[in-house]
Amino acid sequence: MTRRVDLAVVGGGISGLAAAWAGMQQGADVVVLEAGDAPGGKLRTSHVAGVGLDDGADAFLARVPEAVELCEELGLGAELVSPATGTAYVWSEGALRRLPSEQLL
């Protein structure tokens, strides 16, 4: 079966999904080609004892306005959390390290 599309995005990670969203916003018929079992790329969450643990990259700098704008366009603006309003750490090089307050999770 052959399907014609305006835009084929290879990879369902955050960049691929953002590209697909941008194409759809322009009215393109879009298909996302993902080799893995789920979209998200490096963004993954595991649940241990009922607590969600982020397994991959899930933070970005709030000083990048395009990232914040994209989250708002997708209806995720209310889900953004700043480490300044809580405590957020990342495990790196064998130690817990506090995330800078200008990042959003």
Predicted feature residues:
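Extreme N-terminal starter segment of soluble prokaryotic enzymes
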Residues: 2-7
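N-terminal Rossmann-fold NAD(P) dinucleotide-binding loop
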Residues: 16-17
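Dinucleotide-binding Rossmann-like beta1-alpha1 core, especially the glycine-rich loop
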Residues: 49-105
